[in-house]
């Protein structure tokens, strides 16, 4: 899973693409409505004008997608560390985490030393056991 900043960048890229798609759709499929009653309705024989119901339905879908993406972006922004946290609090948290990391690293080193000690003890026991078996076989042969 990607980090939150990468997710945020991807969402921003997606919403920019959605805005562009919406503008392109409106530009290519809108009806030529005059701004006021005094103007004549324009037309373009090469234009592909969508039916009013289809146009409205598609606009609703495009806006819903943009609203959902905006909510996702807001949620990601709110989840970022440091939002509503002062610089001093962030530095204090970093210092606390560094101390905890040093402690955990110390525990890790102790665990590794313990593992090595136990491994050495087991190797010695195995060697003693195999030597004992070898000695008993020699005594039985003699």
Swiss-Prot record:
Name the UniProt record assigns to this protein: Mediator of RNA polymerase II transcription subunit 21
Pfam families: Med21
PANTHER family: MEDIATOR OF RNA POLYMERASE II TRANSCRIPTION SUBUNIT 21 (PTHR13381:SF0), RNA POLYMERASE II HOLOENZYME COMPONENT SRB7 (PTHR13381)
Keyword Transcription regulation set for record: yes
Sample GO molecular function, one term: transcription coregulator activity
Entry function: Component of the Mediator complex, a coactivator involved in the regulated transcription of nearly all RNA polymerase II-dependent genes. Mediator functions as a bridge to convey information from gene-specific regulatory proteins to the basal RNA polymerase II transcription machinery. Mediator is recruited to promoters by direct interactions with regulatory proteins and serves as a scaffold for the assembly of a functional preinitiation complex with RNA polymerase II and the general transcription factors.
UniProt record, GO biological process: regulation of transcription by RNA polymerase II
Main location: nucleus
Subcellular location: Nucleus
Binding partners and assembly: Component of the Mediator complex.
UniProt keyword annotations, A-Z: Activator, Coiled coil, Nucleus, Transcription, Transcription regulation
GO cellular component: mediator complex
Coiled-coil segments on the chain, per record: 87-131
Gene giving rise to this polypeptide: SRB7
Domain of life: Eukaryota
Species, as recorded: Eremothecium gossypii (strain ATCC 10895 / CBS 109.51 / FGSC 9923 / NRRL Y-1056)
Family: Belongs to the Mediator complex subunit 21 family.
Gene3D superfamilies given in the database record: Mediator complex, subunit Med21 (6.10.280.10)
């Amino acid at each position: 899973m990607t980090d939150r900043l990468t997710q945020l960048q991807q969402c921003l890229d997606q919403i920019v693409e959605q805005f562009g798609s919406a503008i392109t759709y409106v530009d290519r499929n809108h009806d030529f409505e005059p701004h006021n009653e005094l103007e004549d309705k324009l037309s373009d024989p090469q234009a592909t004008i969508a039916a009013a119901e289809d146009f409205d339905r598609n606009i609703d879908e495009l806006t819903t997608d943009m609203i959902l993406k905006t909510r996702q972006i807001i949620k990601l922004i709110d989840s970022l560390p440091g939002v509503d946290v002062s610089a001093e609090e962030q530095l204090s948290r970093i210092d606390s985490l560094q101390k905890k990391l040093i402690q955990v690293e110390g525990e890790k080193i102790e665990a590794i030393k313990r593992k090595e000690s136990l491994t050495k003890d087991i190797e010695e026991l195995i060697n003693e056991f195999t030597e004992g078996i070898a000695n008993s076989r020699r005594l039985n042969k003699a």
